[in-house]
Amino acid sequence: MMKVLVVVALLVTLISYSSSEGIDDLEADELLSLMANEQTRKECIPKHHECTSNKHGCCRGSFFKYRCQCTTVVTQDGEQTERCFCGTPPHHKAAELVVGFGKKIFG
């Protein structure tokens, strides 16, 4: 039963990864958009860096693109501001854990 769960989780992860790759391929149909995409990859926001002003500019991790995660911060004056950072969502962390575990088991 445990092997079946690991295989199913691995398949779901691989399908998610391949679909995210397919979306990236669709965005780069023309040469100009491909060149612009390469330029944005060089200028993307790394993990754990602030993305408040550019919420779609996070870099790509080993399997998935990082997501801009926001939180509301209350200053000492009582003023609320939104602060965002690039990070890995929990379900992506779980998928990466399953893939890493699968690599250790199956080599």
Swiss-Prot record:
The keyword DNA-binding does not apply. The keyword Disulfide bond applies. GO terms for cellular component: extracellular region. Belongs to the neurotoxin 19 (CSTX) family. 03 subfamily. This is U1-lycotoxin-Ls1y. InterPro entries: Spider_toxin_CSTX_knottin, Spider_toxin_CSTX_Knottin_CS. Residues 1-20 form the signal peptide. Expressed by the venom gland. GO terms for molecular function: toxin activity. It is found in: Secreted. Disulfide bonds join 44-59, 51-68, 58-86, 70-84. Keywords: Disulfide bond, Knottin, Secreted, Signal, Toxin. Pfam families: Toxin_35.
